[in-house]
Amino acid sequence: MTQAFPSILQKIIQDKTTWIAEKQAQLPLASFQDQLERSDRDFYQAMQQGSKQRPSYILECKKASPSKGLIRAAFDLTEIAEVYQHYATVISVLTDEKYFQGHFADIAQVRQRVTQPILCKDFILSEYQVYLARYAQADAILLMLSVLNDERYTQLATLAHQLGMGVLTETSNEAEFARALALKAKVIGVNNRNLHDLSVDIQRVAQITQHYADQIPPETKIISESGIYQHQQIRDLRHVADGFLIGSSLMQHTDLNHAVRSLLFGEHKVCGLTRPQDVRAVYQQGALYGGLIFVTHSKRCISLRQAQELVTQAPLRFVGVFQDQSIAFICHLATQLRLHAVQLHGNESHEFIRQLRDELPVNCEIWRAICIESSGTSPCQIVENKNIDRYIFDSKTHQQRGGTGKTFDWQLIPHHLKPKSMLAGGITPENIPLALAQGCLGLDLNSGLETYPGVKSHQKVVAAFAQLR
């Protein structure tokens, strides 16, 4: 043990020591040691897939925590595994009972439903816990240098490797990170949480790894732990981390699939969808929203019947695009298609929007397009409307509002609206990095991904979302 525990951690370790003694009396090692088999899921091989260009993700099953208390009351491991299997490199399962409301039995329950390695996340202090983790079917364990000296760490890591399990070596400061390097840990986690007071500094991983940048072997993988709540944070830290361990920020959302996609891929929309295969392709690549255009003069206009087929192809959040159409028409389509939002591209007044809000289903958002001349130079003057959930900043010409395939001067977007706005207009795989740098909530792509109007190029879709990730 290290000589001075942080106060909160010290209490946890005291309780864990008691738990180990009680568990050993209840389930002696001799009763199951002969039944143990080596893991057949390679944690290290899985983590080698991660890179600073395309990070790996350790997604966590976490019911509660000391810092947040109960996080997910409806803790359905089957539901969680069903979502995580599509996105995770490794799945972490909390097994601490007192502080995280976890159980070792949770490991097998998740593992039997997925193909990824399972990480046993606990305060591991003894060989007994390592054996117990493998008995519970874990493929890797967490070892925390904040509670283990080098000799103890080496003993536990060696045993884990003998059982075919990998080790995620957790550090929380520069001294521990230096120890992890000296111990030749293959996967090093940097916990951005202060173990003294449970506060989070998301820049800790950057500060520590940059200090030791010239000492980190190229094959060593760095994982950022704790504090990831937005996709932009992942983008900001990718230059220092090969992967991210994420739990609390996902577990707090009812719609887990949406939460994972939003966090991993960002909140981006592909508009002008007309074909089933395009809906499936953009969802597979990471789109969160799909735009269906009902503006009659648009080259991408579709009928209700076409839309009904499209919305069954993938669980995108669908947005209907309208322009100066009746409230009755908009509400009819919103109800029939169970739209996530309606996007207004015309001259709809504040009173029209107020009435529309009263008539729409309560869970259907209203998005408002603000179209700026592609050659314009005057800053936008926008009177905010409490009934508008999101703004779309798009380009226009004298002939057309939106869907022009042209960009506008992005400096004209009011800075204070960027956190609730999406950027549209002439966005292509080539200018996505610059578009992302504008700081809007997400991007809205359409003609820049097309072969011709209404037909998406799957090659361009793949190229675009590679940039977006």
From Swiss-Prot:
GO molecular function: indole-3-glycerol-phosphate synthase activity; phosphoribosylanthranilate isomerase activity
Source superkingdom: Bacteria
Biological processes annotated in GO: L-tryptophan biosynthetic process
Region (N-(5'-phosphoribosyl)anthranilate isomerase): 268-469
Pathway this chain belongs to: Amino-acid biosynthesis; L-tryptophan biosynthesis; L-tryptophan from chorismate: step 3/5; Amino-acid biosynthesis; L-tryptophan biosynthesis; L-tryptophan from chorismate: step 4/5
Catalytic reactions of this protein: N-(5-phospho-beta-D-ribosyl)anthranilate = 1-(2-carboxyphenylamino)-1-deoxy-D-ribulose 5-phosphate; 1-(2-carboxyphenylamino)-1-deoxy-D-ribulose 5-phosphate + H(+) = (1S,2R)-1-C-(indol-3-yl)glycerol 3-phosphate + CO2 + H2O
PROSITE patterns the record matches: IGPS
UniProt cross-references to HAMAP family, sorted A to Z: IGPS_B, PRAI
Record text on subunit structure and interactions: Monomer.
Record family assignment: In the N-terminal section; belongs to the TrpC family. In the C-terminal section; belongs to the TrpF family.
Functional note: Bifunctional enzyme that catalyzes two sequential steps of tryptophan biosynthetic pathway. The first reaction is catalyzed by the isomerase, coded by the TrpF domain; the second reaction is catalyzed by the synthase, coded by the TrpC domain.
Name of the protein in question: Tryptophan biosynthesis protein TrpCF
Species this chain originates from: Pasteurella multocida (strain Pm70)
Taxonomic lineage from the root: Bacteria, Pseudomonadati, Pseudomonadota, Gammaproteobacteria, Pasteurellales
Gene: trpC
